[in-house]
Regions:
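Helix-turn-helix repeat elements of alpha-solenoid scaffolds
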Residues: 1, 33-36, 71-73, 108-109, ...
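N-terminal segments that cap or nucleate solenoid repeat domains
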Residues: 1-29
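Canonical positions in the second alpha-helix
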Residues: 9, 45, 82-83, 118-119, ...
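Short helix-capping/linker turns of helical repeat alpha-solenoids
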Residues: 12-14, 27-29, 34, 48-51, ...
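Hydrophobic face of amphipathic alpha-helices that form TPR/SEL1-like repeat modules
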Residues: 20-27, 41, 58-65, 94-101, ...
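TPR/TPR-like (Sel1-like) alpha-helical repeat modules
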Residues: 288-295
Length: 295
């Protein structure tokens, strides 16, 4: 339920309060999601204060996606441009995406990079990670692992899960920094705690193998389960294997093969054979289904 004091301020035309209520309707936070109401309130913010920078990324997204209003890519770009001129990091990020993909504008990679860089400088972590990727791959910029890693570090310092994950990879591979496996392990676990499914998988692997940490099968199972909850294919397979073997968890072949089959359905190549055999032979209580086995 929305805070009554906030609603009262919004009714009194407090611009910040109107913006907060609009965001609540936009994402369904404390109130049922309502894109039409959100767009109406975002538009009211613009009418009351045209120099309110943060509103333009939301207005732009509404126009771009047709949320609460008719889709209009030109109006979306216009909104992003207005916000970018007011130093909105989000608007620079969405302008970068627009130029990268040619959405509402003529595709222009260099303009995309320009806006990603400005957004990163203004604190947008998605843009920091994107610039890191570009410098690591030499995509539109000269390849430079040191600069790439610095962008990842900046995102990591803001507790961005992907930034922490990419910084962990840099330390593990020695890209732009001296190789440091224990440091990468610490960072992977931090990223895992922040919810990054890839980091949860690698943290599980680290605890299973003792790579950079003391072996702990229970912790491995814990992190594989966290990643499996996000449908990470390989983590789901690993969790199934642990249940089949009783490693880090109480042995439960039924649960184990269920995870294996789920992993196969998610695309984990290691799971295909065992899932196929299960259906072919009718193992673990599953009926014989040779058609599924062949799939």
């Amino acid at each position: 339920m929305l805070d009554q004091e906030l609603l009262a301020k919004a009714e009194a035309n407090d611009v910040q309060a109107i913006f907060e209520v609009a965001k609540a309707y936009y994402i369904g936070d404390g109130v049922e999601e309502n894109n039409e109401k959100a767009f109406e309130l975002f538009s009211k913010v613009v009418a009351l204060d045209p120099n309110f920078p943060d509103v333009y990324s939301r207005i732009g997204r509404c126009y771009e996606k047709g949320w609460g209003t008719a889709q209009d890519l030109k109006k979306a770009v216009d909104a992003y441009t207005t916000g970018a001129n007011l130093n909105s990091a989000g608007c620079h990020y969405y302008l970068a995406l627009a130029y990268e993909n040619g959405t509402g504008v003529v595709q222009d990679e260099q303009k995309a990079i320009q806006h990603y860089k400005i957004a990163a400088d203004l604190g947008d972590t998605d843009s920091m990670v994107e610039m890191g990727h570009r410098y690591r791959a030499g995509n539109g910029v000269e390849k430079d692992d040191v600069i790439a890693t610095e962008y990842y570090r900046k995102a990591a310092e803001k507790d961005d899960s992907n930034g922490v994950y990419q910084l962990a990879r840099a330390y593990y591979d020695g890209l732009g920094v001296e190789k440091d496996v224990p440091r990468s392990t610490q960072l992977w676990e931090k990223s895992a705690e922040l919810g990054h499914w890839g980091a949860q998988f690698y943290t599980g692997i680290n605890y299973l193998t003792g790579d950079g940490v003391e072996k702990d099968a229970k912790k491995a199972a814990f992190w594989f389960e966290k990643a499996a909850e996000q449908e990470h294919p390989d983590a789901t397979y690993k969790l199934g294997a642990l249940y089949l073997d009783g490693v880090g968890v109480e042995r439960d072949p039924t649960k184990g093969i269920a995870y294996i089959i789920q992993a196969a359905n998610l695309g984990a190549s290691d799971a295909y054979f065992l899932a196929g055999v299960t259906y072919f032979q009718g193992n673990y209580g599953y009926p014989v289904d040779k058609a599924k086995a062949i799939e």
